[in-house]
Every structure is written in C-alpha cells, then in structure tokens.
Amino acid sequence: MMRSLFSGVSGMQNHQTRMDVIGNNVANVNTTGFKRGRVNFQDLISQQLSGASRPNEEVGGVNPKEVGLGVMVASIDTVHTQGALQTTGINTDIAIQGNGFFILKDGEKSFYTTAGAFGVDRDGTLVNPANGMRVQGWMAEDIEGQQIINTSDQTEDLIIPIGQKIDAKATTDVAYACNLDKRLPELPEGANQADILRSTWATDFNVYDTFGEQHKLQMVFSRVPGTNNQWLATVNVDPENQAGTETRVGIGTTDGTENTFIVSFDNYGHLASVTDTAGNVTAPAGQVLVQASYNVVGANPDEGGAPTRHTFNINLGEIGTSRNTITQFAERSTTKAYQQDGYAMGYLENFKIDQSGIITGVYSNGASREIGQLALAGFANQGGLEKAGENTYIQSNNSGIANITVSGVMGKGKLIAGTLEMSNVDLTDQFTDMIITQRGFQAGAKTIQTSDTMLETVLNLKR
C-alpha cells in the first residue's frame, strides 16, 4: 500500500479536528467570557529509507532519506486574550479587565470563570444564576464598629442580605472645616437682631442619639471683643429646647460646665488652640477635639436618677494647617460641619462593587458599609486549565495551583461592575481559518484520490 494514502487520511482527520474547533469558536461568538480555541499541527514520525553518512577523504557527506507519514494535532490551545467589554448597567454583572478568574463553588468543588453574569438568590447569596454555583470572596467582620475584610482567610460564599436591618448608631464625631471671615465686626453690647446677623456666623448640622433620633447641632461663632484672632463658639443641641438638652462642652472631659469655648488663630490665619470655660487648653499640635454632651430626651435616667447624657467629639481640624481645618482669613465665612458618623436605623436597599471588588451596602438611612470583597484566582499556566462546561474551568496537573488574591494584586486585573466580558472570537479570523482548513481537507482528499489512481494503474498492469 502507498504511504501517501495514510498521509492523506491523517490530513483529512486532523483538518476535521481543526474544523471542529473553528465551528465551536463560531458557535460561541456571543458567549459571555468565552475564550477561543486554536489547533496547532505537527508532522508524524518519518520513515527513514537511508541514514546520513559523514564526509570522507573521497566523497562528501550524504543527508538522510526520510518519508513523512502524515500530520497530527500538536495542541489545542485555549487563547486567554481579553474579550470586548459590554456595558449592561446591572450591578451584579462584573467583568475582569486583565488577568484572573472568578472563583465558583459547587459544594467542595472549585471552578473558575471569566463570565461574570452573576445574580443574587433568595438567601442573598451571590451566584451564577445558570447553575447556582456560589461566587467566592471574603465577608466583612464587625470589629469594634469597624467593618474589616481579612483577605488572608479562606474564601467563603458572598452574601448580600437585601432588606437586612442596620441598628441606629449615635454620633461620636463631628468634623468642621473651612473659614471664618477675619473682617467680621465684633458683636457690640446690647446688639439687636441685625447686629447679631452681621457679627456672627452660625451653622447647623444633624446628629443622632443612641435611638437613632435626629437632633440639630448648632454652632454659632462670634468675635471676642478686644482681641484680634479669637472667636467665641456657642454650641447647642436642639437650640429650640436648650433647657431640655443642657448642652455642655469641655476639653478632655465627657461633661463640661458651659456650652461655649474660645477658638484662637495665629497671625497666619491657622488654627492655634481652643480654650474651654474651665481654662483647659488643647495641645499645641495635632487634632483639636472638643467634647460636647447633651441630655438624651426620652431616655431612661441613670441609677442616680440623673438624665442620660450622650457625648461626642467636635473636631475642628489640625493645628497649623489649612486642610480640613477651620481657618481665619479675610474671605467670607464658610465654616460648616462636613462629616459625622451617626445614623438612624435603616435597611439595606442596594449595593455597589468597586474596582477592587469591595461590595458596599447602601442603606435607607444614607449609611454605607462594606459587606465583602470578591476574590480572583490566577494560575502560572492558565492555558493548562481544563474546560468543565458552562463557561467554567478546573485546575489541572499543568495549570498550577490557584493563586487567590484580590484584584489588582500579583498581575490580576481590575473589576468593572455593570459590565460583561464578551467572547474573544473574531469572526474574520475564524472564517479565514475556515477557508484554509477547508483547502487543507480538500488537499488531503486529493492526495487519497491521486494515490488511488496510481494504485489502479498498477492493478491494470495485470491485464
């Protein structure tokens, strides 16, 4: 039999394999996160008719005579290039821009995918809605009122408890910043309402008690008569009920004696110090904190029958600086509270996912807190992963073990919520490869036809 017959058969068989891969690529042109396949060929073993000989004194060397026996598939690679990103606006749709895989769990089995079309089941678990596999990451822990995500722990299911209640939190810190106008006139004795409006700067801000009830915090600044760079600050919680709340302020104490303090500035307009009515002065450097306290109306009295008081810090900024600090320059007054940490009771209404994969819950009371963080897996040889169907991969002997971290670390890409990575199949390339494959298949068939004709000629010699 002629060797060319078997070579032609191998050509047809292996080009059929290549066509199968191309057909699968084309079929998955719109599959989320799909990575195209690629077939590489190599020749089969060659039959040696004669070996090579070295040159001698009389004649030169002779090359070997070898006849190839066909072609075989060298490899079928998965090409992990980036697919195009498509915006969906759905906050559970997540794309990886760069390297990395999402981690899915089915019981104890781990799967990996770049298809981030996720959803939330009835228990709030973030899942792949097509098969129920659970997305892995790290849940935040509440440690002394702070949400901490420990990414060195084992990964776990991510749960987004929509509708979950968050307890009210009393205000513990109120931060003030911006400017007091040095040109503001001193407040004269016996001042009328017009004089007060011209000579003071008042700012209101909402704070919360332990029940989550909202209170108005009012701070009024006025120039200290006979001084250049001092202001009298008067603090009241619920100013319309001053007798009930009995606001008091002090430095280094949870309960002062009066509701006023003196703010001093240096000759450069920067915050210098604060003095309370007891003569206590803040440190010459660092943050300037004044402790304010008030009666919580409606709370049970303490064991001695005294009203329950709530204390919080008034943060005026850092001495000697201008950033996030009260200053005194010859510009209009703009000082106001810009931040406080209390809130009323609320319910989880929505969530968002940032580029590092941190899931932040947004509550009905305006508060937000971290819920968890998505994990990404990387591999030394991602081409060595085995396809497991349903847009997933599993670890193999040649992929290496999964290196699990957050996004943006150790070569992993960033996450983009509201976006999906599409298939990386390029139809132009696939149709071109299809034509080449078809011609290769036809060439193999032609080899068989020609060999058959030659054999027929040999058989006809007998006639």
Curated annotation (Swiss-Prot):
By its UniProt entry, which Pfam families does this protein fall under?
Flg_bb_rod, Flg_bbr_C, FlgE_D2, LlgE_F_G_D1
Q: Which GO terms describe its biological process?
A: bacterial-type flagellum-dependent swarming motility
On whether Oxidoreductase is a keyword of this UniProt record, the answer is no
SUPFAM superfamilies in UniProt: Flagellar hook protein flgE
Query: Cellular component terms, GO, for this chain's entry?
Result: bacterial-type flagellum basal body; bacterial-type flagellum hook; cytosol
Q: In which family does this protein belong, per the annotation? A: Belongs to the flagella basal body rod proteins family.
Mind telling me what this protein is named? Flagellar hook protein FlgE
